[in-house]
């Protein structure tokens, strides 16, 4: 990273940590932090999720603290929300479960992309609030007005902070390389989905900015949906990069109508 990129990245990271602490305190003051944990457990049990240790209701991505000034950031990948493995005390990192393994192996198998998933990628989410399954966020929102407010507020913050970080990194690069954004998982970005606030805010923030052309939308890595979709929509007459770009733009236009 350039010196200015590093400065801006650190500012983003510090604000992220501050927001996690702020949201945590907000629930503590309202005396519903334990209620959130109970709801997270209950919704997982109701969905038949095998028992797992519930450690952290809000998850900051500790992988961000592993980034050093000499790292070459080439991509920002945005998932949905932290799952079972991501929230464990020994992890507190995004995309470390099966989906993360699939993503990591995809880049390892395709060195022509020039991306090390654990070294060249900043991984974020649409909200830092944990659930075993993304759809369970809707249950939390129905059970508590404050949780609903917090889930929406966190989406808006993530959209703003991510768009700003992306644009800042591009504007302060050495001009040699582009930095892309991959939105992986778009089911809840459609219709009356959970992440409509995120979608609409993100589109508004990129309005008139050239960085929008490097935002791509894909199926989620989970259950190999990303790989299956890419395989079905790839041409043998195009490079992998060309196929990825074409597919990512197609999904972006379908979701954002732009």
Enumerate the language-model features and the residues they cover:
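Glycine/proline-rich loop-helix segments at beta-alpha junctions forming the active-site rim
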Residues: 3-4, 8, 131-258
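Short secondary-structure capping micro-motifs at structural edges
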Residues: 61-64, 90-91, 104-113, 165-166
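Residue-level preference for short coil/turn positions at secondary-structure junctions
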Residues: 70-71, 117, 177, 211
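Flexible, glycine- and charge-enriched loops at secondary-structure boundaries
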Residues: 92-100, 148-155
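Conserved alpha-helical elements of sugar-nucleotide-dependent glycosyltransferases
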Residues: 95-106, 198
